[in-house]
């Protein structure tokens, strides 16, 4: 089997490559069909997914069985001012990959986000795959456009929405909180935005389980359990052992101090229903996955040997 991983140097792409290389994750083995797979990792500048001709030629030349698209513009605030860049990475790129995948018969896994939802109609019920999206930010809007293009142009697709992603590699909320705690000693974090922290290990594991099936469609894949950013930050500080305190604040208080920040959904908790009912759900409780992260994390070096 031949697999192309786009955005291979990001948090998720790096973890997917690691699991394909080692044949397993912290959770368990990868599918037997993927053992000894030929893996083609690509990222900018080798492949610009927003360039149709480049994508079409690359996919036709390599003829993969599976394309896993981890490439995206994920800077939520940056998307508000860099509209064209966000559209190219989050909407146009997935369209190009979907068209190329359809032409060559490849399966396409496209990673999306909880930010496609408005988060305004909470009621305490996690949003499943049937919930109607309503993005409130440029990031969410462009990611939703990418989903629609994938659905339209590639029949053999898996759209996988995730949330609050962190990993041993790259920049993420966990590392930001640890570093800020060390530097400032006191942090303020919003306590009225709720969702599902997701370890990239879990997300990569489930994507690899999915991509060898014919169970095409839309999936949610996040850590089990729901918390606020404040709860998440408090658990990060506790597990890290950093001498710092975390105080709660409202979204309005945060916005007053950071007026240029994009709106975030207050309730973006997702339900992994389709995952449970098809390939099964091995995703860990968010606290267990975070504790495992701190057991294995080696600071700037990524993961301990």
Question: Across the structure, where does each feature detected by a protein language model lie?
Answer:
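Rossmann-fold cofactor-recognition segment
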Residues: 38-53
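NAD(P)H-binding glycine-rich loop region in Rossmannoid oxidoreductase-like domains
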Residues: 49-89, 100
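Glycine-rich Rossmann NAD(P)(H)-binding loop
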Residues: 189-194, 219-226, 278
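Mid/C-terminal beta-alpha module of Rossmann-like enzyme folds, strongest
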Residues: 206, 213-260, 301-303
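NAD(P)-dependent short-chain dehydrogenase/reductase
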Residues: 148-195, 200-202, 208
């Amino acid at each position: 089997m031949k697999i192309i991983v786009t955005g291979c140097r990001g948090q998720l792409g790096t973890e997917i490559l690691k699991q394909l290389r080692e044949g397993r994750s912290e959770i368990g083995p990868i599918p037997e069909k993927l053992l000894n797979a030929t893996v083609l990792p690509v990222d900018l500048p080798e492949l610009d997914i927003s360039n149709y001709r480049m994508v079409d030629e690359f996919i036709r030349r390599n003829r993969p069985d599976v394309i896993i698209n981890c490439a995206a513009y994920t800077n939520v605030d940056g998307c508000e001012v860099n509209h064209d860049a966000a559209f190219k990475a989050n909407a146009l790129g997935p369209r190009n990959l979907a068209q190329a995948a359809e032409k060559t018969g490849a399966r396409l896994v496209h990673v999306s986000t909880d930010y496609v939802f408005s988060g305004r109609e909470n009621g305490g019920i996690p949003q499943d795959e049937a919930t109607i999206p309503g993005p409130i930010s440029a990031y969410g809007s462009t990611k939703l456009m990418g989903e629609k293009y994938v659905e339209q142009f590639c029949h053999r697709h898996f759209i996988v929405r995730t949330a609050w992603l962190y990993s041993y590699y790259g920049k993420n909320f966990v590392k930001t909180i640890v570093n800020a705690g060390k530097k400032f000693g006191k942090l303020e974090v919003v306590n009225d935005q709720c969702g599902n922290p997701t370890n990239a290990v879990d997300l990569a594991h489930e994507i690899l389980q999915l991509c060898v099936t014919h169970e095409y469609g839309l999936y949610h894949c996040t850590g089990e359990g729901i918390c606020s950013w404040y709860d998440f930050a408090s658990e990060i500080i506790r597990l890290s052992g950093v001498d710092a305190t975390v105080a709660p604040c409202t979204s309005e208080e945060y916005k007053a101090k950071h007026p240029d920040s994009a709106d975030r959904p207050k309730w973006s908790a997702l339900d992994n229903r389709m995952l449970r009912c098809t390939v099964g759900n091995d995703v860990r409780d968010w606290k267990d996955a975070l504790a495992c992260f701190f057991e294995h994390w080696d600071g700037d070096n990524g993961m301990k040997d």
